[in-house]
Structures are given as structure tokens and as C-alpha cells.
Amino acid sequence: MSFLLLTPPPCLLIPPPPLSHRRSSSLFLKHPFQPSPRPLSFCKPSALRLRANTTVNSLKALETIKPYLQSESKTVLLGWLCSCVSVVSLSQIVPRLGSFTSNLNANAASLTKLKGECLVLAGLVLAKVVAYYLQQAFLWEAALNTVYKIRVFAYRRVLERELEFFEGGNGISSGDIAYRITAEASEVADTIYALLNTVVPSAIQISVMTAHMIVASPALTLVSAMVIPSVALLIAYLGDRLRKISRKAQIASAQLSTYLNEVLPAILFVKANNAEISESVRFQRFARADLDERFKKKKMKSLIPQIVQVMYLGSLSIFCVGAVILAGSSLSSSAIVSFVASLAFLIDPVQDLGKAYNELKQGEPAIERLFDLTSLESKVIERPEAIQLEKVAGEVELCDISFKYDENMLPVLDGLNLHIKAGETVALVGPSGGGKTTLIKLLLRLYEPSSGSIIIDKIDIKDIKLESLRKHVGLVSQDTTLFSGTIADNIGYRDLTTGIDMKRVELAAKTANADEFIRNLPEGYNTGVGPRGSSLSGGQKQRLAIARALYQKSSILILDEATSALDSLSELLVREALERVMQDHTVIVIAHRLETVMMAQRVFLVERGKLKELNRSSLLSTHKDSLTSAGLVI
């Protein structure tokens, strides 16, 4: 019980949702086309998972679960209490079976007593059935609530990671993360339930049934005990094999999930390139690898319980010995019946222990991979003394900023200095890969600069709370991100869980030139946008993105190629919205379109990590041709 008395992590304060659990099943079908399941170069296991310690043993796996199970101790105790009731009922059934058989040939005077025994037996059986049902219900509740807390905490830690974790080659793909938090978390729930429902209840039942067997015949009990050690050693060996096979199976499933998460969102690109057949072949490679590894796991999982069946062979020898003892001793037939019944009820919990060990070894890799997510630490760390900004004027200073994505790479930014006054609009132009977007990521503190500092209103951004910094710096990118939901949900995204202010939503939409088209939609602001905003045009999505940035009342706005992919009319509407926004915001514009660049008061060229100011008036004459030929403006 001591393992339940640990301090829970902060995530455990989150109330659990209504319970639901559904076991997944596997269907193994042969397919006439079975290509070699060679791993593809872009989808190596090393790119899909953390470099976790593969020698995690069972005790360590259990240790990681303890804090999350602590708040479920009351539910677990109720389940184990029901288990005690079930075992006590069963222990009362065993001796009554012996007396019941001895009374079968009794005279008529004993029939009344026999009827009474039948009623008692029926009552005990009913009590056992009800208690066992409640035991399972309570323990499933504890297991599912525990995994819910682990899921919430793991996902929170993923969201807290810096951008490098998702963009670098050593992180985890989104498909792998989704697989861990869904499918593998369900396997962890199965493992926790198997342990809770087996270890203590089976130990109680084994103890009670063994006591009955000893009372009936110590000699027969000794013969029974001789079977157990050899079987236990074999189960331990096979369990270790199962853990290794299970890990390979989970990696194969994660690869398949990652592949689907990459290809399905790009279905337009696939069809445009007539790649349906090639993608089908690639899918079959991953699916075949997943099938093969799962099949190995299922075969090993099926083998271990069968080993426990060897104990039944041992019981045959016990019956033979029992017959000899009965023939040459005073052991009654009722005692033999009690012993055999106790042995039958003993074999089930011993077999359940084997199955629980089976579940533990199968679940260990899932526990390890899920808890890899909870152990993630962000490289962008908020200082304890960081302050909350109530109001921001919008002055931005970049002081000797240098940055490179990897120690072995050349600097993307090299000693860059820039001072932007509050309310000023600055445009950044330059070739792709020159460092423009990197500069924006540093301003949002998605990365830490290699050297130098970024100052907002005379305060180093490292001294500002991350939530406060990103509240006052709004981003509108070329690739607009919209989530399934209504237009109001997407504009008021920041307040989605706390309550959206519809007046602010409508005001932001009007400023962003979006109110008119929104009101022409069937349900206005309550119109669904579809997956990733699929029901809206590019211009409409871009205006919603501007409205979203305005809704959060950001003093500093970053426009990263906000008009590059729009048609002329949409671009005109977006530019009109931007002109209104620029009147009372500090705006940093990254653009290639000359019309958008000329909206800025100052223009800078970012090239090879350096910053050079361009004469704004000469952009229309002297520098225009050279910038256009270099592809810096269009």
C-alpha cells in the first residue's frame, strides 16, 4: 500500500472525464502483394522516438506510475475490498461442496438440511459474482483515470517544448506523439488494470485456497507446490522476450501512424502528381512491417498463458497420489472434494498472475515511450522572477543577435542590430534562408539566440513571462492555421476555454475586413470552417488570421508573407486591413511583394545573417530592378 502514498504531480488536480474504454483488436489478413518491409530512409525509427533507455525493468515501469495512481487510492481500496468479499464467498463455497456431496446419499430427514445448503451455496455464488463485478468496475475506473492524468501531463509537456524539438531531426514526429498518447496510453491502461485486478486479489485467493488445501491434505499440497517454481522461471524468460517484441511492434505502429499523418493532409499533392499507386505501395510496406511485428507479439502473448496450463498436468499426478492416499488412509471423500475444489480455484489466480506478468511485459515499452513525453524539458525556460506585462508600447531592440540552428552549422544571424520605435512599421526583405523568419521566431522566444538580447520596452524578453510576451506579439503567417470549429472560435482562439468576447470578435473582424464576408455566410460567426479552414478561400483565411491577432490586443504584429499567396482582390482587401492595423501597432512585415513592402516606413535587407537598411524612396527607382532580378521583391 505504500506505493499509493506519494505526492502527485500538479496535473493530478485536473478532474477526470467520464469513463470509457474500448479494447482494440487485431485482424491479420494475408494480402497477395507483400513487399519487403524495409524501413524508408525518411522514416527511420531514430527519427520517430526519443533515445530512451531500452533496459527499463518492471520495477522502474511500476515506479513511474505510482504518483499518478496515488489519487485513485480510495477507488483501488474499494476494488480490493470487493475482491476480499469475493474470495471470502469463494472460501465458504469450498467446504460446503464437500459436505454437500456427503449429504447426497443421506436419508429423508437430511433433505431439509440439504435444501438449506443449496440456498446458502446460491447466496454465496451470488455474493461472489456481484463482488467480482464491482471489483472490476472500481479497478477499471482507477486504471483509466490514472492514464487520463498521464495523458494530460504528457501532452502538456509536449506543448511546453521549444520549437526546435518539433523542427529538428532529433525530436518526435507528430504522428508518433499522437500514437503514444492514444494507442499506447490505452495499452498502459490495460497494464495498470491487469496489475490492480490480479496481484492483490490473486494473492488473497491463493492464500485462502492454499490454507484449505493444507487442511485437507498437506501431502497433496506439497506435490502441488513442486510444479510452480519451474513454471515461474519459464514465464519470466518468456516475459522478457515479450517486452522486446512489444517494443518493436509499437515502433512499427508509430511509423505507420506517422506516414498516414504526413500523406493524408497532402492528398491534393498526391493526386496532382498521380502518386496514388506509389503511396499505396509505400503504405503496404509500413502496414506489412506493422502486421509482422504485431503478429510476433500476439504469438508470444498467446504462448505464456499456455505455459501456465502445464500446472493442470501437474494436477493429474496429484489426483493419482490422492487416490493412493485415499485408498490407504482415513482421508474422507469430502476432504478430497474440498481439496480438488481448492486446487481448481487456486489454478485460476496463478494463471491470472501469469497473464498479468504477460500484460506488464507487453505494456513496459508503452509505459516507457509514454513517460518519455512526461520527462521532456524545454530549452526555453521561463525565469522564476519573470514579469507580467500589462501594457506594451511596442518598442523593439535587437542587440547584437547571433543564432545558428546547430553547433556545426553556419550562423543564420550574425551580430544583427535593429531598433524599431513604438508604432513604427518595418519591412524585412531578403532571399529564402536569409534569416527573416528565424528573427521572428527569436522575437517570439520560440528559440534562444546564441548570443545577444532582444528588448521590448526596455525589458529583456527573458525577463518577461512567455504567456505575456506572446500575448503582446501577434503573428500572421503565410500558412494560416485554422482549427475545426466556428469562425468565432478561430478569431477568439486565445479565449476558447475561458469564454470568447463576441464584441471583440466582431470589432477585430471589421478591422481585418472580414466582417462583411462572415455575415454573408449561412450562420455568420457560428459558421464552421471545416478541417484546417477548408471551406474558406485563401483571402478569407488570411483576414481571419489578422482578426485573430487583433482580438488578442497585441501591440506588436508580425506579418510573415501575409499576402504572398493571394489573388489581386484578396490582396487588396488584406492590404486595406493592414493599413488600418498599422496606425496603432508596431508592425514587422516580411514580404516579397513590393506593394506590401512599401507600406513600411523603413525597409531592411536580411541576407547571410546581416542586416542592411535600404533607402525607401530609391526602392521605386534605383534598387527596384536589382531587387527584382535577385527575386527579393516582385
UniProtKB/Swiss-Prot annotation:
Name of the protein: ABC transporter B family member 29, chloroplastic
Location of the ABC transmembrane type-1 domain: 77-362
Transit peptide: 1-51
CDD domains per UniProt: ABC_6TM_exporters
Residue positions binding ATP: G430, P431, S432, G433, G434, G435, K436, T437
InterPro entries, per database record: AAA+_ATPase, ABC1_TM_dom, ABC1_TM_sf, ABC_transporter-like_ATP-bd, ABC_transporter-like_CS, P-loop_NTPase, Type_1_exporter
Span of domain ABC transporter: 396-633
PROSITE patterns assigned to the protein according to its UniProt record, in alphabetical order: ABC_TM1F, ABC_TRANSPORTER_1, ABC_TRANSPORTER_2
UniProt-annotated location(s): Plastid, Chloroplast membrane
Principal subcellular localisation of the protein: plastid
Membrane-spanning intervals of the chain: 75-95, 119-139, 195-215, 219-239, 307-327, 330-350
Domain of life of the organism encoding this protein: Eukaryota
UniProt keywords, alphabetically: ATP-binding, Chloroplast, Membrane, Nucleotide-binding, Plastid, Transit peptide, Transmembrane, Transmembrane helix, Transport
